[in-house]
């Protein structure tokens, strides 16, 4: 019980200091737009295009410009730009067309996270933080050269397109190693058949929250058609995509995954279930553990404030003031495993040792500041 007094004395300082945010997705508020010249009108058009990309990435919505507040900001994007620079991209040495064409400039822009988030909230749109679940992709493409995996040195052009589209929507993309273990665990044919059991078993070593399984076919007309499985825990979603060119087919699939994830994790400020909830947390061994825990909770986009209301030797009760509902908060807490659920979750009441007036809703164990 000797730890209670210093914890209480340091509480206010901890809440102020606990501002570090662990990001899974870098450059969420940045965009790069090709331009031909450095005029003011060109800058405004490019800044508007870049801002729309950022708004789509941060909101998790594929369409944002239909909101009046967003349309107004896109017409006058300069106030949201905090930094920009022009640079000359190098043309490939083996690209003969680059000799005849005027080389484009690339305008790199950074936008204010605070202003972007405020704009989305004023437009009634959610904000999806940089802490996002990873997605493992097993993709087989059937082209003129046969059916092959995408990745591991195979079909690099398709891998680059997949990376580009994941970056566009802010999805942390993971490709298999395609080492001897993967070769033994999963075949091209099993992926082509969209065998969920085989894919699940082969994917266990990677620990990704989502697994995307796809088979894509290229036709002589340039048309691409693809079938997909999205494995989300025990949930299996199936869908199709197509397009004139591989990029369209892959973009459609990435959009589908991003929409599913954003529905679960993007936070709508002041949502119907917003409020506060008491959670009990054990495994707090010392002051450092306490500081790490409170910093972590304060860093979550869904948490407006995290306030300690009761502290014991190795456990405490925290009042979470939420921007959205507790169900979504539970998804955030489960995403990286720093807080693990313990038995009895969802049963309102006061656990042994906790004052009876504190109606704890969920119970967790703190397992560390990083995993």
List the model feature ranges, each with a label.
Residues 47-73, 133, 137-144, 148-192, ...:
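N-terminal segment of the mature soluble domain
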Residues 17-19:
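N-terminal signal peptide c-region/cleavage motif recognized by signal peptidases
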Residues 81-90, 174-177, 191-222, 310, ...:
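A short, hydrophobic beta-strand-centered structural micro-motif
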Residues 25-32, 36, 203-251, 326-330, ...:
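Amphipathic beta-strand/beta-sheet edge segments enriched in Tyr/Trp
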Residues 239-246, 265, 275-371:
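C-terminal soluble interaction/assembly domains
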Residues 63, 67-139, 151-152:
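Signal peptide-directed extracytoplasmic domains
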Residues 1-8:
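Bacterial N-terminal signal peptides that target proteins for export
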